[in-house]
Amino acid sequence: MAKINVLLLCGGGGAEHDISLMSARFFETSLAKSDQFSVLTLTLDKQGRYHTQDGNLCSLTNRREIRFEDPSIAPWAVDYVIPCIHGFPGETGDIQSYFNLIQLPYFGCESEASSNCFNKITAKMWFSALGVPNTPYIFLHQFDQEAIAQTQAAFDTWGSVFIKAASQGSSVGCYKVDVRDNIAKVLEEAFGYAPYVVVEKTIKARELEVAVYEYQGDIIATLPGEIICDTNKFYSFDEKYAKDSKARTDVVASNLSPKLCLQIQDYAIKAFKGMKLRHLSRIDFFLTQDDEILLNEINTFPGLTPISMFPKMLQNHGHDFTEYLSDVISQQLGR
């Protein structure tokens, strides 16, 4: 049987460019363990240009093939795409829209689901509509005195807030505010990352994560894992990826009752189904001291770096990542 030509896209040129490259290496290693696939890895730069690993410029055409600027290199037919791009344009749904247009099968959530989850305001509206509890919030559409006043009122009610750019990933443009006088400055910074901002009540809680994915026709939700940070810190971009980070992860969270685990898994699957996610996701929750469960956010293309939770939780659940990938791709292509 002929091999499946898999195009692995990474980079994107945004704040998570380097993280995307690390995740792509995990895909390369996993795909190499199977003789089903022939893989071409391309990096997308800030200018929207694709590069091979040798530095050759190329493009993905509407004929579903890669054409190289060097005319001596023959076009490469594409059967399937893995858009391993964190943030824009991968998790925002933009690149998936192009794949839909040229009828090219791809791994991961479709464009509408990706967009709905990436925008924190839209996502929270969906959570509430689906009956999944989430953190109290307000949202703002421009930086002005009214926005400052609304945020100050929320701060006065809640005592502490998170101010988040509505359409960024990996805690980019996300700030914890404990001092009222800092609100205006932080709001201005957040609006520098996105045209909309969400202000959330700070929740003192455990940070739990669930890998939710499709395998052999079933939707799987793993046992919750846990992110453990220093006291009074949140899981910022630096805490995630800095070499001197004090944060640690537990693939299976300790001291959770079976009832709580089941409730968290039920909410995760409810969100996965209700928002019409596909193939994979990492769904993050808060668990308060009173055992209140709050959905924090959904990551439609979770990181696959050495510290990332998704592949560890999948493996802990008893599934091999290469076999999982092969199953998803084969089911989609009908092979």
UniProtKB/Swiss-Prot annotation:
Binds 2 magnesium or manganese ions per subunit. It is an enzyme of class 6 (ligase). Its main location: cytoplasm. The keyword Metal-binding applies. The keyword Nucleotide-binding applies. SUPFAM superfamilies: Glutathione synthetase ATP-binding domain-like (SSF56059), PreATP-grasp domain (SSF52440). Its cofactor is Mg(2+); Mn(2+). GO terms for cellular component: cytosol. GO terms for biological process: cell wall organization; peptidoglycan biosynthetic process; regulation of cell shape. This is D-alanine--D-alanine ligase. It comes from Shewanella denitrificans (strain OS217 / ATCC BAA-1090 / DSM 15013). The gene is ddl.
